[in-house]
């Protein structure tokens, strides 16, 4: 049985998003079955009335525009992506922005235009085990007893499934 895949919302309602692809990724546009390109490096996505324009760092023209841009690693687990200025601790006293890295696919999805203008969401499509590893390492201290870390993994896996 294949490992379950999860769609985890990372960023909601942004006009612009800066990110870095560490490794090579296939770029699929608007649910196309075949990749449009192989990409890596630094990028900027800007949401407008025609969808999401994808700009290579320093470029004068966007590479392409689409309603959904899926960046899928050529080899799962060997490449990651870094999102700049991600807000963590939303609505808590410790809310702040930081740059965070993720394994799996990055999906940039245009929302329906509203009075707030064109916006996009960033979604991480990732395998269950990679997700659990990231959750446990982000929520628990490395100094926790092994039994506590194992219990957290069992609880998290049970909750997801």
What are these model-derived regions, one by one?
Residues 1-161:
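Conserved, single-site charged/polar hotspot
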